[in-house]
Amino acid sequence: MGSGGDSLLGGRGSLPLLLLLIMGGMAQDSPPQILVHPQDQLFQGPGPARMSCQASGQPPPTIRWLLNGQPLSMVPPDPHHLLPDGTLLLLQPPARGHAHDGQALSTDLGVYTCEASNRLGTAVSRGARLSVAVLREDFQIQPRDMVAVVGEQFTLECGPPWGHPEPTVSWWKDGKPLALQPGRHTVSGGSLLMARAEKSDEGTYMCVATNSAGHRESRAARVSIQEPQDYTEPVELLAVRIQLENVTLLNPDPAEGPKPRPAVWLSWKVSGPAAPAQSYTALFRTQTAPGGQGAPWAEELLAGWQSAELGGLHWGQDYEFKVRPSSGRARGPDSNVLLLRLPEKVPSAPPQEVTLKPGNGTVFVSWVPPPAENHNGIIRGYQVWSLGNTSLPPANWTVVGEQTQLEIATHMPGSYCVQVAAVTGAGAGEPSRPVCLLLEQAMERATQEPSEHGPWTLEQLRATLKRPEVIATCGVALWLLLLGTAVCIHRRRRARVHLGPGLYRYTSEDAILKHRMDHSDSQWLADTWRSTSGSRDLSSSSSLSSRLGADARDPLDCRRSLLSWDSRSPGVPLLPDTSTFYGSLIAELPSSTPARPSPQVPAVRRLPPQLAQLSSPCSSSDSLCSRRGLSSPRLSLAPAEAWKAKKKQELQHANSSPLLRGSHSLELRACELGNRGSKNLSQSPGAVPQALVAWRALGPKLLSSSNELVTRHLPPAPLFPHETPPTQSQQTQPPVAPQAPSSILLPAAPIPILSPCSPPSPQASSLSGPSPASSRLSSSSLSSLGEDQDSVLTPEEVALCLELSEGEETPRNSVSPMPRAPSPPTTYGYISVPTASEFTDMGRTGGGVGPKGGVLLCPPRPCLTPTPSEGSLANGWGSASEDNAASARASLVSSSDGSFLADAHFARALAVAVDSFGFGLEPREADCVFIDASSPPSPRDEIFLTPNLSLPLWEWRPDWLEDMEVSHTQRLGRGMPPWPPDSQISSQRSQLHCRMPKAGASPVDYS
């Protein structure tokens, strides 16, 4: 019982102990840790190479070696062997090679790593590089023979061969190592530098290169040290003659590698003095094309006395060689020149930067030529190979010349790989590495790259917009667009303010006088006449003067005003001009005979208050519109006073003209016809106190065949007694309503009558016109003989002047000064057709008598060039309205040549012919015509003009003032009348008046 219990207790006590032992053992385990890392090693000697690696851990870790990340198999015939302590043995290391051995060039055998692992983890050591020692056979630079002078510095060059590790250079002299003396000997980069040459430095020198792979010895170089000599006699060196006998190409040395450079052997012969040159130098250069500039000579010191080797040349070049002797600083003459052409070799380097770019069904191949030192001749072209694959066969192309690109057509998608090689005369060189390009179908590329299409297009657009030509094109287009816009705006604005068709004139009187001298291109009737309704003018709120010569449809009526009533401004405005000379005059006949007005008592009327506001022609600020006030001088003032009133202190050509005075025959005829017309006017509901007498004047007929001043006399008129006609109240005058629209230009003020008329009669007044001779005294412009603006026509008088009823009679004056019975004439515009009974009176009164004296009735003045609207008044009332049939008759008359229609006799004869064709109509418009405002009277008017003096007519030319003054001075000095009678003109006028119309024709008034 007791023994059994002890065994049980003993069994129970061993279990915890076992657990403690197990836990203690587990507590001693640890992960592996590398204690000794492998080191870089170099094979030295024939024995195996060792690489050590030690690691710690519990349990002990397992060691494994890896080469370049790959585990080693350690199975024969693998040269690697693992020792139990983890050391790696390389049993067969690579042999130490030579320069031509390709294996010797690969000195790096790889990177070895050690890996230790157990159940707790793995540890990896650092990498160790294993390499082999290599030393090539050839020296990069061999030492050369040379001659040195005592006390001078010289250098022995040596370039050791390539090796691993880098070889060290040592110099040997005469088979023994050279003891380097500090300050005298210096080794730099393998070359030996001697600061001061001594005579003991002569000997044979050799360069030795040494590393772990062994050592290499260079060729022996002989150094000669000479004493310094006095070169006072350089004649000896100049006498040396060198003959270059031969230049031979040496075979390439295989020890120099697969790409050796050419070398030549030079042989020469020296002749001359016994003392030879101390050294010889080879001079060489490449041969240039004929006519080209030669390349510079390259110099190379030769290591021989009569022959030497020369390197540093290039294959495929033509060289020129020569030798030059030298002794210290002195140089002798050069030898002869020999030529040598080196053969070409294949290029030693492939083309560089080969690229492939896809195109539209093509592939663009481009490259860069190989470096110049690797051409080995002249590159004559390139060879391009396309490597074949499963879908594309191989192909090749030859590119001739210096072209460095090729376009290859692609027929199907796939992978394209190309190689390029340079070609010389020796053949194609080394090809480049293959460059591949994968071409996919358009649908596949679109499905694979849907998101790249948009950004690529945007980027391409940005690049295109940044190009200079695109920016310049956009700038030019924008500039042209702005220019076109500006031109359109300018044309639209100009279309609103442009002047109407027709001729235009300056308001300067000098320009007018010069313009009147040439009328070869002027038409008798202007094509710019406008027809303005008289009722519209009268009902408008604007002043009458602002309506003169303006078209209601013209928005710029102020600018197109046809009259300027103030003094001429320095700036000459441009106004329309029709180059016609037809004017008219309106005179108001009082019912009673007024006394002749004097300068102290002016016989004028004041402007009514309701018309005072309309005295300004227009409210525009335009300079021309602001000067349209009536400024015609009053006839009641003396010429001198009127001259001062107009501020004319001196006589000028442009603003001075003689005051023409009418004859008594004209005054008598006007009063007589005025008495006739009052009978017709008295038939209206109200009594007419005053009547308007209209004088119509045809413009002067210019003689194109002569530029001389031609004078024409006024017809004579007998004296008549001054009687006072009865007066009537102005308030009883009835207004006459307009019957037809008219384009008549209205004056701004009535013209007072300055001469008395015949005794009163029932015919108080009438509208009458002067004879053809007197009608030439004025031009067809609008004016008023009142100077101020207070003498204006009342609306009733204007309406009476503009339009008369169809039943009214408008008698015309005749050339004859004798009165005749009133008869209803027929008018054609400005042409008056009398009755048949009046033709007999004209035959009896065709002749004229000399002037007996007279009083100034309404003297016409030299006036401005007529305007289009004034020409309408002078050329026909029938053109006033479009619905008037008489306008067709006036148009027929006005379409004729103005050179003969200026004659009133011919015009009247033409009117008879027109009426005989059936165009005769009753007149519907008042024959009221006006004359233009003339310049103020000159103070000289009082000198040579008298009431009894009748002035002739003249035609204008620039020197008219001088001729007039000379003619008047001569004739007045002799006591003769200033203007002799013109019998020829009177006879012609009489003959014209005696003509009778044909039977059936309408009677014509030749007055």
Swiss-Prot record:
Effect on the protein upon substituting Y280S: In AOVD3; uncertain significance
MF terms (GO), sorted A to Z: cell-cell adhesion mediator activity; signaling receptor activity
Keyword Plastid belongs to the record: no
Effect annotated for changing D622H: In AOVD3; uncertain significance
Effect of H411Q: In AOVD3; uncertain significance
Impact noted for substituting A749L: In AOVD3; uncertain significance; requires 2 nucleotide substitutions
Limits of the Fibronectin type-III domain: 248-345, 347-442
GO terms under cellular component: axon; external side of plasma membrane; extracellular exosome; membrane; plasma membrane
Impact after mutating R64C: In AOVD3; loss of endothelial barrier function in a dextran permeability assay
Domain Ig-like C2-type, first and last residues per copy: 32-131, 137-224
Keyword field: Angiogenesis, Developmental protein, Differentiation, Disease variant, Disulfide bond, Glycoprotein, Immunoglobulin domain, Phosphoprotein, Receptor, Repeat, Signal
Residues annotated as glycosylated: N246, N360, N389, N396, N680
Tissue-specific expression: Specifically expressed in endothelial cells. Expressed in endothelial and intimal cells of the ascending aorta.
Modified-residue entries (Phosphoserine), positions: S805, S938
Keyword Phosphoprotein: yes
Annotated CDD domains: FN3 (cd00063), IgI_2_Robo (cd05724)
Gene Ontology terms: biological process: angiogenesis; axon guidance; blood vessel endothelial cell migration; dendrite self-avoidance; establishment of endothelial barrier; homophilic cell adhesion via plasma membrane adhesion molecules; negative regulation of blood vessel endothelial cell migration; regulation of cell migration
Gene3D superfamilies linked: Immunoglobulins (2.60.40.10)
Disulfide bonds: C53-C114, C158-C207
Disease: Aortic valve disease 3: A common defect in the aortic valve in which two rather than three leaflets are present. It is often associated with aortic valve calcification, stenosis and insufficiency. In extreme cases, the blood flow may be so restricted that the left ventricle fails to grow, resulting in hypoplastic left heart syndrome. AOVD3 features are bicuspid aortic valve, aortic valve stenosis, and ascending aortic aneurysm. Some patients have atrial septal defects. AOVD3 inheritance is autosomal dominant with incomplete penetrance.
Function of the molecule: Receptor for Slit proteins, at least for SLIT2, and seems to be involved in angiogenesis and vascular patterning. May mediate the inhibition of primary endothelial cell migration by Slit proteins. Involved in the maintenance of endothelial barrier organization and function.
UniProt-recorded name of the protein: Roundabout homolog 4
Source organism: Homo sapiens (Human)
